[in-house]
A protein has these predicted regions:
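Short, well-ordered amphipathic alpha-helical segments that serve as non-catalytic structural scaffolds
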Residues: 1-12, 191-195
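Short beta-strand-loop/turn "lid" adjacent to the catalytic site in phosphate-handling enzymes
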Residues: 6-42, 46
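General beta-strand structural signal in soluble alpha/beta enzymes
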Residues: 24, 52-57, 124
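Conserved phosphate-binding catalytic cores of ATP/NTP-utilizing and phosphoryl-transfer enzymes
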Residues: 54-76
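Short beta-strand scaffold segments in enzyme catalytic cores
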Residues: 77, 85-89
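Glycine-rich phosphate-binding loop plus the immediately following alpha-helix
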Residues: 92-134, 158-159, 163-167
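A contiguous, well-structured pocket-lining segment that forms one wall/lid of small-molecule binding clefts
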Residues: 130-203
């Protein structure tokens, strides 16, 4: 973590004396990573006598949009990352209402697993997307959560890819990776869009 901080300060051409405050993610996330980050931030805050600001990971994703233009309420945020797939309704500043999200795997997890199964490696997101651009939607995959709720599911889609690849290999058939990546991405992203559009219509 120290090396990352030093590299960041060097790239910004700044010193710790020029930093106004220290922000640190306290939740949600992997416990080990959070503990390391919080302890490091507390140490920096103590040593350099800087205010310490606790930040919610999901709120950080949402409020990062203020860097482009000020957010206007009410708003609907679709938060998508390796560990999260959530629909958050905000009627005002720091007013978060979780109205839907994945019931099992996050979409980022699903991308990583699919990339590994079809031999694209890690990280899955950019590799699956690149392969999908070269492919056609030729594989018939299940449409998850085809209902009126705002909830999503990606584990069934992931399992269907794993089973499809296994069965094709058992039969001695070639798996068309680009086509499978395209078919998967179309179904996965369609679910995000459908659920977001449903929420927009309601709220």
């Amino acid at each position: 973590v120290t090396m990352v901080l030093e590299e960041t300060l060097n790239k910004a051409n700044m010193t710790m004396d020029e930093i106004d405050a220290i922000a640190v993610t306290y939740a949600p996330g992997l416990l080990g990573s959070l503990l390391v980050g919080v302890e490091f931030a507390k140490t920096l805050s103590f040593v350099y006598k800087k205010p310490l600001i606790a930040v919610n990971h999901i709120a950080g994703h949402i409020y990062a949009n203020n860097l482009e233009k000020p957010m206007q309420f009410p708003l609907l945020a679709l938060v998508v990352s390796g560990g999260h797939t959530d629909l958050i309704l905000m009627k005002g500043d720091y007013e978060f209402e979780h109205i839907g999200g994945t019931l099992d795997d996050a979409i980022g997890e699903c991308y990583d697993k699919v990339a590994r199964v079809i031999g694209l490696g890690y990280p899955g997101g950019p590799k699956v997307e690149k392969a999908a651009l070269e492919g056609e939607h030729t594989y018939d995959l299940p449409i998850p959560m085809n209902d009126d709720s705002f909830n999503m599911s990606f584990s069934g889609l992931k399992s269907s890819i794993i089973n499809l690849v296994h069965n094709e290999k058992q039969r001695g058939n070639e798996v068309r990776n680009n086509d499978l990546a395209r078919s998967f991405q179309d179904v996965a992203v369609d679910q995000l869009c459908r659920k977001t559009e449903l929420a927009i219509k309601k709220y």
